A protein has these predicted regions:
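N-terminal alpha-helical scaffold/docking segments in eukaryotic complex subunits
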Residues: 1-66, 307, 314
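Core solenoid repeat modules with strong leucine/isoleucine-rich periodicity
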Residues: 67, 86, 98, 115-116, ...
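Ankyrin-repeat and related helical/solenoid repeat scaffolds used for protein-protein interactions
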Residues: 237-311
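Core register positions within helices of long alpha-helical scaffolds
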Residues: 32, 63-66, 94-97, 125-128, ...
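Short inter-helical turns and helix N-cap capping residues of alpha-solenoid HEAT/ARM repeat scaffolds
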Residues: 21-22, 52-53, 83-84, 114-115, ...
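Amphipathic alpha-helical scaffolding segments comprising HEAT/armadillo-like alpha-solenoid repeats
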Residues: 6-17, 38-50, 69-81, 100-112, ...
């Protein structure tokens, strides 16, 4: 008996309602399935995934999350071509929650689909699985005409952290016409281990999109590239405070004493998040020359800033014991 045939013979009120002529009754029954006492609800879910009503199929696509069986994955891949957008998106969302790499084979079979939505959804599902066989399709996806496909392909490469993708990711970070693709590529360069990516990241600090600049400022700090200090100091004057926050955080990680001036200036910024990051960075740098500015911050109107300032001052004192 097949898994779908098993659904036909399964007793219980839910099974009866899933066969009701009223689509709304079936839809509500699907919503209840994950919370039912049925020992094996997968056959019922698979039947609902093939329901004649698109709303029922959409609910089934949501309800099947957590099932890793090939039958469920195959059915969800089929729903990526559904006539209703809600159903397609529900299927894509559930596929993105797959945890077992054993499903990568089914996903890779669909990665060359001509539909950009399907292709992007498959890349999105492959990303957390980190399977080596997704490298080649993802590299190819960087040149796809659809920005959504390029975004998801770039995300796959970021998760794989393969040295062979550094060059292509650098090119994308600097040249892709879509700002979100550039932002994802900049973040993906965070797995690099040398200064090869420094030109691309410093270039990104001048990107027209502030989200790309923000990502670049953060990535430079993660890599702890000393050659980035001057660029990060300049980024502390960015017109978007979100970029300054990341730059301040990175300057602290780099323990860049040359940034004491710009970090001290940030202690008076109207955005408290930036003041907090500047205080933390000054504490990490540990230079006694920051003490006067930090003592002023002890009167900050934000209690979190005041608390962090006390910690930063203690940190500086510990790093500079009296002789």
């Amino acid at each position: 008996m097949s898994i779908l045939q098993a659904a036909e013979s399964m007793p219980g009120d839910l099974a009866v309602r899933l066969a009701d002529a009223d689509a709304e009754v079936r839809r509500i029954a699907v919503m209840e399935l994950p919370y039912s006492d049925e020992d094996n609800i997968l056959p019922l879910l698979l039947k609902a995934l093939a329901d004649a009503d698109p709303q029922v199929r959409a609910e089934a696509a949501k309800a099947v999350e957590g099932f890793e069986e090939p039958e469920a994955v195959t059915a969800l891949l089929g729903l990526l071509h559904d006539t209703m957008e809600e159903t397609r998106r529900a299927a894509a969302d559930t596929l993105s929650e797959l945890k077992s790499s054993s499903n990568s084979g089914l996903l890779l079979q669909a990665v060359d689909d001509a539909d950009p939505f399907v292709k992007a959804a498959v890349f999105r599902a492959l990303r957390p699985l980190r399977v080596a066989d997704s490298l080649a399709p993802a590299l190819s996806g960087l040149d796809h005409p659809s920005p959504q496909v390029r975004r998801e392909a770039t995300g796959v490469l970021g998760y794989l952290k393969h040295a062979g993708s550094l060059g292509p990711l650098t090119r994308v970070a600097m040249n892709d016409p879509d700002p979100e693709v550039r932002r994802i590529a900049v973040g993906a360069l965070g797995f690099a281990t040398d200064v090869e990516v420094l030109p691309a990241l410093t270039h990104a600090l001048n990107d027209s999109s502030w989200q790309v600049r923000e990502e670049a400022a953060g990535t430079l700090g993660k890599l702890k590239l000393s050659g980035a200090v001057d660029y990060l100091v300049t980024a502390m004057a960015d017109r978007y405070w979100q970029v300054r926050v990341r730059a301040a955080r990175s300057l602290g990680r780099l323990k860049a004493a040359v940034s004491l001036g710009v970090l001290s200036e940030a202690l008076t910024h109207e955005i408290s998040n930036l003041r907090k990051e500047a205080v933390i960075a000054l504490g990490e740098i540990g230079d006694p020359r920051a003490i006067p500015a930090l003592e002023t911050a002890l009167e900050d109107p934000d209690p979190d800033v005041r608390k962090l300032t006390q910690l930063a001052l203690k940190q500086i004192q510990l790093n500079n014991p009296p002789r």
